[in-house]
Amino acid sequence: DEWWGKGFTEWTNVSKATAQFVGHYQPHLPGELGFYDLRLPEVMRQQVDLAKHFGIGGFCFYYYWFGGRRLLERPLQMFLENPGLDIGFCYCWANENWSRRWDGLEDSILLAQQHSPEDDIAFIDALADAFRDPRYVRVDGKPLLIVYQVALLPDAAATAQRWRRRVIELGFDGIHLVAAKTFDMIDVSRYGFDAVVEFPPHQTAMQDISGEFQALNLEFRGRIYDFEELAKRFGKEDRSDQLLYKTVMPSWDNDARKPGAGHTFVNATPRVYAAWLADACRVTASRALPDHRMLFVNAWNEWAEGAHLEPDRRWGYAYLDATARVLSRYYRDPELNDRLQAHNAGFVKRHDAAVVVHLYFEDLYLKAGGGYYFYSDTLKL
């Protein structure tokens, strides 16, 4: 309330977003779950049930830690206290400074990171209860921890060493450290980490096609990219010199957070997403060790960035359906297809055919007179 105004949530930006150019899909409005409140236990129960129903194995939660101070911790604590939410989970430390970046004020820091050897130890101690949870994701028997911007750590290698020593002291077999491939090129050996996880749209060599679109907002200064081109290329990429976890995104558009200045991917559809996911699954399935056959989706519910598997009013369950259909080729869950068929059987079929009328002809013109209507020799509306 102090920083953003009383009652502000992500939904504030999501609901007021508007189209910035012709064909721009905004706003992204939620479907089944509505404008939910994550402080309510029943909401998280719905999310877990929905994810499991469509074959998703776990959630990666952002963890906000600023020199001992936590933010947005209530949903995570609620999850830990409810073992009935039977789905895997892990943490990604969002280790940036907390700033007013949504307003475009990059230097207006609200809460800064505070790094020290003592804070490294305190950070691991704060995570210990989650690491002990049987639902927590482990790789080679070690709890997995992702760091969003490893290059921001003053001495990442020293921090990694302290973390490894501390988890051993706490009785764990070690820790599996993963650097997110965000703003910097990552060499895990340099930072003392074990693996890298892709984080599209970061580090993706995007194709800018902004000039192909007509702006609706004359002050629009955002960027428009081709999702389909990215999906065809990025899903097949792999590296042999370090362990790389693949990540797929269903779509992306952060204009809700940065009106008129966002980055938007067009041509994002469930079909294109499914093809990207299938490519990433093929790469992941080739891993020699089962624990390394792990794949991420960005994201489950980043509504203000247009990246969500949760149902919306445009696509409904199509992205979840596409996810389940692709995973069913690789995921050893014999009941997944049965659940998918049962879910789809519940939809009401309203039409047997779709009629598409092309209304653009050379002899078609717009006439004003008591109202607007289109007219041609053969068609009048």
State where each predicted segment sits.
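Glycan-processing catalytic domains of CAZymes
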Residues: D1-N344
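ER/Golgi luminal nucleotide-sugar-dependent glycosyltransferases, focusing on the catalytic module
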Residues: G316, R325-L381
